[in-house]
């Protein structure tokens, strides 16, 4: 069986037309005849490229406003025909072999992402002929090359030059895998969209039903492997890093690594925690993370001051940590980090060339640049359980000054309000039960992950004492309500003067009374931030 077949005829029909003119020109220069449809054929002709319209080839016009273009035996026979097996049938019906199919699909995802998208808009952007051709060509990859990614154009032309206008079976097989991945992702998007639409569309008057409709009945997820890893969370666990396509928001998954060793499983998890936390602040900020928990967070007039203050919270835990900034990493800050501590990862929106030169002296330090960000984009969070998947909206909500309810007799000062909001933002990113002490926009002690809220508070106090930081006059944030007054009594003993928490306990009044007895400020957010 001949494994490499010269490409003599190609069918081009694309929605994303970037690079298609140059690719078509390259095919023509190599003697390939072109078939095409609608807008693609028009674009090629306008650029002086010889092309035959599919409707002229089949003798059957496009119809139903473009719904039927390529669904014809002369097209699919040419794609599916097995060389050496179906030749006689193809000759009998005057079907020419199609050796390459270049297709990408209607922009369904972009259409449904529009705020004003109607169900009719979505329906008209469901591609039928495209996926059919893609699957046909991928099925017959022994004889046909299927191209769904514009990024493959140059490599394909280069290989054709090396192989007498043909592609190897290995290449065609790889292209077929990409094609099946492409159609699977496309169908998943459609299924997810309609799955979450069905209840609100048909029962819009039933609010509860509409809420159920936010999540599809069947959830189809598509992620692309970005990186294989030496191991996972522990040395005996195999692992890989998968990412979503077309992520618009600055994130660890889209960050560019400027230097250093490959990111490990734990590096990625910790860097994500650090970056998402530092994105909460508009002022120059630094977040230092260890084992997915912030161990030091601070604001400053610039990121150097923010880093120095964040490091001061817990220098011991900062060793081997992850450092994130919300401003460009500059030379002075990079120098301070490299001279002071061992660090696994540094991530910032941008990195100055001078800072990059400084970090080069520590070649193993992973330096990442994630780009700037604006407001957070709503997304889903997933948590795997044995035999299932918990799905929820990502916790992107945050209160501001107008949302706070002061329930104590004593009113907070302007600085205390600033510190309370700062402390509350940090607590959101600390594993529950979370207690954070802060003063002047700097964490003083962080207690994370304890089964008892009181013990988290004790740990925060111990950490502050160990580093010589004064708790007296600090504010305290708790990610969830205080079920009893004991947490407030303990806080008062160490000098906490203001407390922020969600409220909502059956004993809220008892807790408020405790704050008043100690002349403390108590502020309720009415929003919880559990983190497990």
UniProtKB/Swiss-Prot annotation:
SUPFAM superfamilies assigned: Cytidine deaminase-like, Methylglyoxal synthase-like
Spell out the reaction equation it catalyses.
Answer: (6R)-10-formyltetrahydrofolate + 5-amino-1-(5-phospho-beta-D-ribosyl)imidazole-4-carboxamide = 5-formamido-1-(5-phospho-D-ribosyl)imidazole-4-carboxamide + (6S)-5,6,7,8-tetrahydrofolate; IMP + H2O = 5-formamido-1-(5-phospho-D-ribosyl)imidazole-4-carboxamide
The annotated pathway is: Purine metabolism; IMP biosynthesis via de novo pathway; 5-formamido-1-(5-phospho-D-ribosyl)imidazole-4-carboxamide from 5-amino-1-(5-phospho-D-ribosyl)imidazole-4-carboxamide (10-formyl THF route): step 1/1; Purine metabolism; IMP biosynthesis via de novo pathway; IMP from 5-formamido-1-(5-phospho-D-ribosyl)imidazole-4-carboxamide: step 1/1
One example of the protein's molecular function in GO is: phosphoribosylaminoimidazolecarboxamide formyltransferase activity
What SMART domains does UniProt report for this protein, alphabetically? AICARFT_IMPCHas, MGS
Q: Which NCBIfam families match?
A: PRK00881.1 (NF002049), purH (TIGR00355)
By its UniProt entry, which HAMAP family does this protein fall under?
PurH
The similarity annotation says: Belongs to the PurH family.
Protein name (record): Bifunctional purine biosynthesis protein PurH
